[in-house]
Amino acid sequence: MRTIYLQLVGLVLIGLMGFAPGAVAAEEAGFKPIFDGKTLNGWKAPDMSHWSVEEGAITGRSTQEHPVKSNQFLVWQLGELDDFELKLKYRISGTSSANSGVQVRSRVDKDGHVAGYQADIDRAGQWAGALYDERGRGMLATRGQKTIIDSDGKTTYTAIGDPKTLMAIINKDGWNDYHITALGNGITLEINGKVTAVVVDHDQKNRDRSGVLALQLHAGPPMAVQFKDIQLKRLGMCQKKKVVMVAGPRSHGYGAHEHNAGWLLLAKMLNENMSGIQAAVYTNGWPRDPTAFDNADAVAIFCDGGGGHVVMRHLEETDKLAKKGVGIACFHYGVEVPKGEPGNYLLDWIGGYFETFWSVNPHWEAEFKKLPKHPITRGVKPFSMNDEWYYHMRFVEDMKNVTPILTAIPPDSTRRRGNDAHGGNPHVRARMGMPEHVAWAYERPDGGRGFGFTGGHWHWSWASNDFRKLVLNSLVWITGAEVPPDGIPSKTPSLDELEANQDYPKPDNWDRERIQQMIEQWNH
């Protein structure tokens, strides 16, 4: 991108979408490779037989012997796109009907077909440089066109270049540079340094602000398309705050420590109910996406803890984020790391942590009779919940800048068991009958925000309206966004929704009726 492109596209985006001048990235830095040039690691298609790496390029190929009868898509597996710039080189060969494209902010349908925004590529020159909505609204902007789509779907077209002149800059037989920028509701396409299409999409029903990246191999006569030097740069979210939700690997059994299912459920609720929030989930451990945190306003970690905590190999990386003001939150076992350097980091990030031989992790019924006045408690009524509520956390000295959010008095029986790293210890026994904090908010001296929450053992607890709302509120608060006066709205998830995405198969003796009765009791 650079001077010419920034001046043109910057003016287009600012004029059409009301962005501040600083919203468009002004530096080349920040692009990271997402294809290693050697393997298809991190890329996957339903039928991999058409895809390979040749001459350092991802290659999609159809032949007379192995034709493509329906469009094929190679999907990047390591993350999704929201606001971004993508740069790559492409080359296409075959007959004049050879066609391809780059899918962005798209979805994968059940049949493996990828639907959504497509930066078009073809050999004949009819579609190259256009923006198409695959399996959707069809052509959005032809080459040389700027399209504004109103909220009711009506379109206004303006010429931004001559299609033939723009086609003349495309190398029919050689490599071409494709540069795709998506910021807010706007998408801009550029080939070989020239803007070919601009779309500003205000159609809330049909537009997408996030989704997958995929490469297309079109059905038809034999052809080949190649992609190389694929680089991604995430942009600060336009009129949104972003929380990156890191889910740890599978852990206990069905319905417990369901990191993936829990975060996928809550992220869906945030994205559906908070237009100013973008929640992105990375499942099964620390993200392999090298750009995962580049435009994050907050990071929320739900995982097993101790020495196996997902952050243990990424302490310095996470600390750099915190020092930039990125919010940090840890949930359930995720509040525990080893004492020493890891524990000190959590004290810096969230104001407290589970320290072995100091804190304890019993299961008990916590009754939260009174809630403090805080954005995280907005719309939340006093409630009770049986959970593995860890307590007696190690907090920063004098609990400076820490606000207790959930406080209850544990049964004395939870303090008596043994003398070990997680059970009873003299420190907790000295506090018989005293209140303990099991969730807290932290306002860091650097301006960032932290949150710790020790509940979340049982996946079904997300069906408790007050339990769930408090956590949703916390995920918004740590981004720096304003929590609505009545908290984050969301519908009580159904049993089918709760059972989705779990790590383990459902046991034969699973009692759905018992869970449904608990949910009704929580929300009566």
Where are these regions (language model features)?
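Extracellular ligand-binding/catalytic regions of CAZymes and related secreted enzymes
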Residues: 238-240, 265, 283, 414, ...
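Solvent-exposed loop/turn segments at secondary-structure junctions
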Residues: 65-66, 91-96, 108-110, 124-127, ...
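Helical hinge/lid and interdomain linker segments adjacent to catalytic or ligand-binding clefts
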Residues: 245-246, 251-337
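A glycine-rich, often tryptophan-bearing local segment used as a flexible ligand/cofactor-contacting loop or short
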Residues: 308-382
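Carbohydrate-interacting regions of secretory-pathway proteins
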Residues: 24-238, 346, 352-353, 360, ...
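Catalytic beta-strand/loop cores that center a nucleophilic Ser/Cys/Thr
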Residues: 357-446
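Positively charged n-region of N-terminal signal peptides that target proteins for export
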Residues: 1-6
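Bacterial N-terminal signal peptides
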Residues: 7-20
